[in-house]
């Protein structure tokens, strides 16, 4: 909950990618996101519920390394620790690069990190206090 009156929270993240079609396939097929809007062949907006991921194809000035892009990672909440483990194996089976394998953290959460086709790091996270909450 925001401490600023009227501010409801983060609406979306926008990513610059080399190939919007490849990125779209990854986020749909691997992470199960649906297309909300596709105004043209260089832009697509995806969602898995109350979130929004904007993907924009950039050819000029694309920073090729993840370090140059200044984005640490995206985090997706998962319903259970067991499901995090299952997803890691499903991602391995699909050929997705695992950046950091499954780990149980000291606060009782658990996660692994993978990378999308552009090297953007994604954390798949079970967090006991959040994973079972439903957004209304």
Where are these regions (language model features)?
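Alpha-helical elements of the RecA-like P-loop NTPase motor core of helicases
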Residues: 24-25, 85, 122-123
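Conserved short beta-strand elements that form part of the metal-binding/catalytic scaffold
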Residues: 34-68, 121-127
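Short secondary-structure junctions
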Residues: 32-38, 98-101
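Amphipathic alpha-helical segments
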Residues: 21-34
